[in-house]
Design a protein with these regions (language model features):
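Immediate flanking context of iron-sulfur cluster ligation sites
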Residues: 203-224
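Iron-sulfur (Fe-S) cluster-binding segments and ferredoxin-like electron-carrier domains
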Residues: 219-222, 227-249
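AMP-forming adenylation/ATP pyrophosphatase catalytic core
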Residues: 24, 140, 231, 248-252
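ATP-dependent adenylation/nucleotidyltransferase module used to activate substrates
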Residues: 3-204
Length: 252
């Protein structure tokens, strides 16, 4: 079975992956407002795909990212942008991103196999919503900014998980059993953060319009100490001598 993500190998002369070999497509894209999902949005827009974006308010402490998602959706003129509320996910707790009693780890990048910022079954839920929306819109492509290099401990960012969900889409939907082939695209799955930064630049993405911090201040200013901030800064520092892009000023 072909993999659910369709990565085109990049070279210095061709930094932007070519579109998979089919005609113009309709896709549902998971848009958080962070660097990875924004880069995916810029990429599929470059490909000429018709984009329906989904964002989620699940009680995350970094809810300010949703404002960035709205701005990105407007800038890239997506066909539609839906904000889905999943209050129960936040109510369940169990993650530093949704449970105020669990502190977001600082300066702890790579110290645990599965960090406490993992939100139980989050991508499973997000992809299920995306699949439902895709079926109503006649879309066959679902795009997610999952990355298995920077967050190798997240079980719902692994290739095996995405392959399995593609099978779920085929077996568990009317469109699937009638022969529609849904495909999960994770174009950044095996790309380093520096590689993502380079791709974002090649696509002309305004990276300062994205928010990556897990524990931001009320105005979106980053803590610069959580895993996500450290990965972002590392990516910019490694990308052709690039420097950190705001909003990454330290909170006061």
């Amino acid at each position: 079975m072909s993999p659910p993500f369709h990565l085109q190998r990049k070279s210095p002369s061709t930094p932007v992956p070519a579109a998979p070999a089919r005609g113009k497509r309709i896709c549902v894209l998971l848009l958080s407002g962070g660097l990875d999902s924004a880069t995916c949005l810029a990429l599929v827009t470059r490909w000429g795909w018709n984009v329906h974006a989904l964002s989620f308010d699940y009680g995350q402490r970094h809810r300010v990212e949703l404002a960035a998602a709205r701005r990105l959706a407007k800038k890239y003129r997506v066909a539609s942008h839906r904000l889905i509320a999943i209050p129960s996910l936040g109510a369940f707790g169990g993650s530093a991103l949704t449970d105020p009693s669990i502190r977001v780890p600082k300066k702890a990048l790579g110290k645990t196999r599965i960090p406490v910022t993992y939100v139980p079954a989050r991508n499973t839920l997000f992809l299920a919503y995306a699949l439902s929306f895709a079926e109503t819109r006649g879309a066959t492509e679902i795009v997610i900014g999952a990355n298995a290099l920077d967050y190798s401990g997240y079980p719902d960012c692994r290739p095996a998980f995405l392959r399995a969900f593609e099978k779920v889409a085929r077996l568990g939907t009317k469109a699937g059993v009638e022969g529609t082939a849904f495909r999960i695209h994770a174009p950044l799955l095996k790309t380093s953060k520096a590689g993502i930064v380079r791709l974002a630049r090649a696509l002309g993405l305004d990276t300062s319009a994205t928010i990556s911090c897990y524990d931001p201040g009320p105005a979106g200013q980053a803590c610069r100490e959580c895993d996500s901030c450290l990965l972002r800064e590392k990516g910019f520092s490694e990308a052709d001598g690039g420097k950190v892009i705001l909003p990454l000023r330290r909170r006061t």
